[in-house]
């Protein structure tokens, strides 16, 4: 009851509190190299003309996958992981050289070296143990977002823009439930409000996406769509007027443009329709990660980093009524259909449960179930 009361109080405060914050989230392709980061900087600089801005960034494209490979190779005591670490470090050095003025490069390299020193220490421990624990894997994966955001922060500082880097591990708090990291939203929102109140003069904040920590201070990660989730949490916690998700596509499309060349960008769409399209294949947003802003009624703008002048897609509770009867068509790839038939199924208690339990143990998600009224046939996808 106390938790529910505090949630009601927080929502009332949000309605009453005038917001001057906007949250911009950039994905891995948006920060993949110096040229792309320059695009990001231009977008953020223009955004600062409107409101205070909080930027959430993913790791550079491909970095997280490489970090996972590094962890697995270290657990196998395969020295190839050291080569991958060196390659990744060199990649970030190249971004620094291409992005920053000469006088700021030593500072950026020092920040990058700190992260890689930590990575090397963790992987050495993994090698000695011959085991990659979930805690170690989370710590290894966290390096990607730490690297990208520290470089981006120094870029803004080199331009005379007072950017404040915030460590999301100290703000976003998780607890373990059934082996899964679950965000403690009440504590997280309180932390966000508290840290932003400490810097009332700052107009720009840079935050690593995807990473958090538990109540013992151990680094944790937020799973698929983790950076979007981070952005959603900060949007709610900062009482943002809008969440902008900047990616490498022009917004939500009427259909997959790789399949339907005439597909168009959907300019306005409701939360419900956007979540439905995303559930069935549209990969612009991942429904669980944007649920916090949907619950609070914060608009979501999906925009193209490489064509910032394009309208994009505005996702909101009550969009303008569309002329088209069908808003969009989505598709799901790599789907297997399992059909079970036979008289042996009839009248057997728990038969469906046994099937679903078997699929669950093999990390297989079910998106569709049909069953004949005779209970003679059942299909799952």
Regions found by a protein language model. Give the residues of each.
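A conserved regulatory-domain signal marking ACT and ACT-like small-molecule sensing domains
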Residues: 310-381
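Nucleotide/pyrophosphate-binding catalytic subdomain
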Residues: 3-290
